[in-house]
Amino acid sequence: MIETYSQPSPRSVATGLPASMKIFMYLLTVFLITQMIGSVPFAVYLHRRLDKVEEEASLHEDFVFVKKLKRCNKGEGSLSLLNCEEMRRQFEDLVKDISLNKEEKKEKSFEMQRGDEDPQIAAHVVSEANSNAASVLQWAKKGYYTMKSNLVVLENGRQLTVKREGLYYVYTQVTFCSNREPLSQRPFIVSLWLKPSSGSERILLRAANTHSSSKLCEQQSIHLGGVFELQAGASVFVNVTEASQVIHGIGFSSIGLLKL
């Protein structure tokens, strides 16, 4: 009888982690993720809390400084051994810094407002004697004169020319002697003329004054003024019937304009 013997097959080696190890790794992963998520709001809270603590500490220092300053003003500085002079100097420097900051803000605000607005245009010139005795009056930048902007110029000493269009208040005052020769009966006439950049000249305003029989110079003044729309390059000038009767000098005869 032949007996056969079969060798048992080797047992297969188990692969993979045990179930307990898998559970441990899962719990560890959940814990780490939870800790990471929870640390973010905690860090934000801690940062805000530190800022608040610093602010409270600063306020406390300010309160202590003010309290010490009050004690100095009450004459208790020598008793508490406080350096009152140093504290007063620090307080004065602080007040100066605050005042300077306010002034700088006001200046910046004013400059911004001025930048948004149109530049101010104004002119005022006084009469000047003309040896030619021309009917168009001569003007000069002397005495109490004004040339507020380079957008208005005095051309040829006779006319004010604007370089920007807009509404302008234009005025003139002419002072003259009202006495006349017996044969001359013409009134003294003052005319404010407009010379546009293109086109013919025209009268804006006109006024007249009758003569006087007095042989002495009786000073009289004619004032003309009105609001007109002037184009860029337009000019204004004054014409009189008898230039020899005009009285020149500061306060007597003048012409001016102001952009509204």
Curated annotation (Swiss-Prot):
Modifications made to the protein after synthesis: The soluble form derives from the membrane form by proteolytic processing.
* Residues that span the membrane, as ranges: 23-43
For the Cytoplasmic compartment, the record's topological domain ranges are: 1-22
Q: Kindly state the subunit structure of this protein.
A: Homotrimer. Interacts with CD28. CD40 ligand, soluble form: Exists as either a monomer or a homotrimer. Forms a ternary complex between CD40 and integrins for CD40-CD40LG signaling.
Which GO BP terms sit in this record?
B cell differentiation; B cell proliferation; CD40 signaling pathway; cell surface receptor signaling pathway; cellular response to tumor necrosis factor; dendritic cell differentiation; inflammatory response; integrin-mediated signaling pathway
The entry's localization annotation reads: Cell membrane; Cell surface
Q: Which residues lie on this side of the membrane: Extracellular?
A: 44-260
Q: Which Pfam families match?
A: TNF
**Gene (name only):** Cd40lg
Indicate the annotated site residue(s) for Cleavage.
E111, M112
Under the heading InterPro entries, the entry gives: CD40L, TNF_CS, TNF_dom, Tumour_necrosis_fac-like_dom
Q: Which residues are glycosylated?
A: N239
User: Which coarse location class applies to the principal site listed for this UniProt protein?
Assistant: membrane
Q: What is this protein called?
A: CD40 ligand
